[in-house]
Each structure stands twice: as structure tokens, then as C-alpha cells.
Amino acid sequence: MKRTAFAAIAVSTALLCGCADSLPFTEKPAYHEKNCTMNAEISCGELSAQAKVTRRGEGDWEFAFTEPKELMGVVVTLGDEGVTASLGALSVTAEPSAVYNMLPQIIARAVDALPDTPADKISEADGILTLENECADGRIVVTAQKSTGDLITLKCPYQRLAVCFSDIADEICESADTEEVRIIE
């Protein structure tokens, strides 16, 4: 009787655990998979720039440069059509290897790859996640808030690239059917 009761408890515990999305000790933290707008201070060697960055989804990014003054107003868009650069009404397909076009591509690829980061390449200290990835651009290290998934920094030593993110806001849009405003997550 005791064996039957023990077996029933063991089987029901296993079944209940199997219904959960993930086990508590193997759960991957949520990183930056949301659509959002943020400011980015970008430095690459002696070059530096600031941009308002909008992520609309994987592979769909916009970098609106605000500094230096030579780039102010230039918008680099990454999407299905490739890389385009525009200034006002003038829009051109950008040379992907140009430095100010290459940097947004590295940043976008690195952030889009965060959900695929292996668990052994993720560490945490004081609520800050550090994620390390290898890609064609070399080793990339990203830090993010564990609680929100908001990006803090991105570094790619091979390209001498460092990015500091700030003022991260979830992208807000209006519903097409009503005038209600909702946050896209």
C-alpha cells in the first residue's frame, strides 16, 4: 500500500512538472525581445555618434542620428530591403560596409541574437545580466537589466565598438480600429 501511494505521488508530481512551461532552475531570463525606442551613444575607435534607435522587431531597426552635426538628421533603416540611409526626402540604398551603416548592423544583429544566447554564456550580478555571443563581427558582450530586459551596454572589442543605451521606452502605437492607445510588448 505504501509503495502504491509513493508511486502515485511520484507519478503525479512528474506529470505536474511536465505541464509547466519551464522548470524554475532552467528558466531563461527575458532579454530585450520587445519593440522599443532608446537613445544610444555609439563610439567606434575615434568615431562617436548619438542616435535615437527604434526597434520594431527582429531585423527591423531605425537609427536616427542626432550627433555629430555632420550626421544630424540622417536616418539609417535596416529591414527586408537591406540598409537604406535617408536625409529628409532623399533616400538611398546604403553601402553596407560604410562605417556608419556597418555599426547599426552590428548592433541590430547582436541584440536580435540575444534570445539565442546559450545559458552558459549568461551571468548575473546585482540584477544585471551579462550575455556573451560570438558572431561574424567577433565577440560581443551585452549587459541588460534582469528585471526589465532593458539594454545597458553593448561592446564588440574586435570592431572597437561600444554603445551605451538610455531612455528606453516601450513603443506605443494607436490601434487601427479604435482610438485606444496600447503598449506593444
For the regions a protein language model found, what residue spans apply to each?
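Hydrophobic/aromatic beta-strand elements that line small-molecule binding cavities or substrate pockets
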Residues: 50-55, 76, 140-144, 165
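Residue-level detector of beta-strand structural context in well-folded domains
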Residues: 40, 51-52, 74, 83, ...
